Design a protein with these regions (language model features):
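Nucleotide-activated chemistry modules centered on ATP-dependent adenylation/adenylyltransferase
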Residues: 2-248
Length: 248
């Protein structure tokens, strides 16, 4: 169990990256990307860290292909440090990546957590073990305000995973994050940030991207209560995203 001291320090998590070198935990989704955006405005990025599935082909958190993750990193101009891990070995591998980042000059880990205490405490514990500070620029922000800021800044993200047991539909896969979708999700009783795992996104463009990340949608895959949109990097440079569903 995390100590009361850990939670008492939570307010500092918002600003710990200011003026400091940081490494960002990167899922490829909207929250980690928005946190990276804010941290880049005040701190000095040294890279991104990603934990992959055991085979090393997809990210452990969002199931994003390694080629797409690396294309995102290239688009924002940062190196990415990735390592494969099972769920059982996840913490050990994550701490190893943090220690590697520290050797390269990082002082703080930046994450896109909003308000899940378990997530905040876990990141607090592993950063302490690695000798780093913790920065969470989005911590305790209003969910609707956060996703609307993401849209208004010009980021573009597509839904790639949905939890069918939490009100999401298979037909939601492939939709862009827009103000209209935010309104619709709220009307359906769904958190527009998907903070509890209702859905995951893939960011393909935005103000910190030097160019869009070209992806191609392939097929929908069902796995129990989840549905996934299989995607791949489009080496030809096309963009398989419907213009009519782009954010304003």
């Amino acid at each position: 169990m995390e100590s009361a001291m850990d939670m008492a320090e939570a307010p500092n998590w918002k600003h710990n990256a200011c003026g400091r070198k940081f490494v960002a935990s990167f899922s490829g989704g909207k929250d980690s990307t928005l946190a990276l955006y804010h941290a880049m405005n005040t701190g000095k990025p040294v890279g991104l860290i990603v934990v992959m599935e055991e085979e090393g082909r997809r990210s452990r958190s969002h199931g994003i292909p390694e080629a797409v993750i690396r294309a995102q990193a290239e688009a924002v101009g940062l190196p990415v440090h990735a390592a494969p891990a099972s769920w059982e070995a996840y913490e050990k591998v994550f701490i190893g990546l943090l220690e590697q980042a520290k050797r390269q000059g990082a002082e703080v880990l930046v994450t896109g957590d909003l308000d899940m205490p378990a997530h905040g405490c876990w990141h607090d514990r592993v950063t302490r073990r690695a000798g780093l500070g913790l920065g969470m620029p989005l911590w305790e922000r209003d969910h609707v305000e956060t996703v609307r800021e993401f849209i208004d800044l010009g980021f573009q993200a597509v839904l790639v995973t949905v939890n069918l047991s939490m009100g999401m539909r298979e037909a939601d896969l492939g939709r862009m994050i827009t103000h209209e979708l935010v309104d619709e999700l709220a009307a359906r009783g769904i958190d527009p940030c998907g903070e509890s795992g209702e859905f995951h996104t893939l960011v393909i463009d935005g103000p910190i991207f030097r160019h869009p990340v070209p992806v191609r949608k392939r097929e929908v895959v069902r796995d129990g209560e989840y549905a996934f949109l299989s995607i791949e990097l489009d080496e030809a440079g096309g963009q398989d995203v419907p213009d009519s569903d782009r954010g304003r």
